[in-house]
Amino acid sequence: MTATDFIVAIELGSSKITGIAGKKLPDGSIQVLAMASENASDCIRKGVIYNLDKTTLSLTSIIKKLESILKVSIGKVYIGMGGQSLRTIRNTEVRHLEEETKISQELIDTIKDSTRGVPIVGYQILGVAPQEYKVGNDLVTEPVGVQTDHIEGRFLNIIARKNLKENIYQCCEYVPIEVAEDADDLISPLVLADAVLTNSEKRSGCVLVDFGADTTTVSIYKNNILRHLAVIPLGGNNITKDICSQQIEEEDAEALKQQFGQAYIEPKEDDDENKVYSLGGKCSINAILLEDIIEARVNEILDNVLNQISLSGYENKLLAGAILTGGGINLKNMEVAFTKRTKIEKVRMAKETQITLKGIEIKKDGSTNTLIALLAAGKEDCSLVKPEPTKPEPVKKLSSATVIEGQLFTTDGRSPAEVEEEEELKRKMEKEAIFAEQKAKKEALEAEKKRKAECEELIQEAVQLKNEEKYGEAMKKLKRASAMNIPEKEEAINAIEQEVKELKEKNSITGKLAKFFTTILDED
């Protein structure tokens, strides 16, 4: 049975890369159609690709597994960006207007675009979260329609090292598979928050902590706005490695952690110092030693979480408390440990999202929440070619086949394996051709987007030069902007050009003399 109009999402986790295909239903739920995963320990570190070849192989394998279940080729995917180096920084953009002007959405968009253009060495701005706008002496979140001659936009820029995004796109190009156009800046912690947090929690103020294998991500919300985001390079794997330091194999260390580990243990006076935890004679460790190792590392992670909450400046404003998610929350007593260490009393364990799922059974332990969130964020149909509806394909027969050594050969001497190989090659070439066409379209759109950004930059430079009374230079910038032939910018260019001409005339010697004589005549 084939599936059409489905969405495919892939999560690049530190322990495994997982792909999922699902279909959005009219009632708002998602029907999960297929799921596949590959080990990521040798290609993903701290949530970031470090071995491109192995990541490409894993992605290729996952795509093939999903296609095998769906019976349809996959043309594009949604991949979230997360991991170490992802964080937020504050930025402010100011605009001085010539006179009292009603703020338009176009002006707000221009200010927001300007903050995206702020250069940060070695980093790339993946997203911008507006905080508030200072209009006059007032702070507002929705300034459109307000009259003012001065506006100050305060933003939170979401940044990451340039290779974070570049490596994802490079691996997808090698597969080859296209990244969906509207997934260009799909940031995993943001879509996770949309899927896990309630509107009330975002509004009242909360911290979302995602305990992963190699990283712990902290996201803080207040008044429905992202206020702080940071990725701590510590996770569940650090606990496992600490246990390994006791001459224990990694697989056994993970088993000991899951079977006997606790994030918090109430102190006891009569602790048995000789108590031992054992995996059926395979390996063993002193119970108190294991408890101390786990508790020490958990406390280190929680101290870093608390530090990020403090750095945000919102530690006393989180009325909805903390929401914990991710595979790490399955460590026993994690909720108690979090409360004891951070002093945050209100804690919710989010082992599943707010999204209703149907179809294939999905783990409800917090480990798949980001994957489900990425699937829910998808909008485009990810199938490569839609098959003919309901029309069954005729059964193919080998004509004039001859039996030779147990195999069927066609009259031209090809074996079934060779026929299948040729068909597979043909399908691959068709897929690559479609991918190349889609890539060309995307590059054209990106080029157009870049042209518009350059035009907007020229306009802003012209406005600045106009304000500095450098009218000749301002006109040169406007002529360059006009020569780019961008229809939606023509009106703005003409308006500024007219304003420059009027100001130039007004401030010329002739203009000043005319104004002088007019003043004298008015006085007479």
Model-derived segments and their meaning:
Residues L318-R341:
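Glycine-rich phosphate-binding loops at beta-strand->alpha-helix junctions
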Residues A9-I10, G19, I79, C172, ...:
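Residue-level signature of catalytic and energy-coupling elements of molecular machines
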Residues I486-I496:
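Boundary/linker segments of alpha-helical solenoid repeat arrays
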Residues I63-G75, L302, L306-A320:
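Phosphate/pyrophosphate-binding loops at sites that engage ATP/ADP/AMP, CoA/4′-phosphopantetheine
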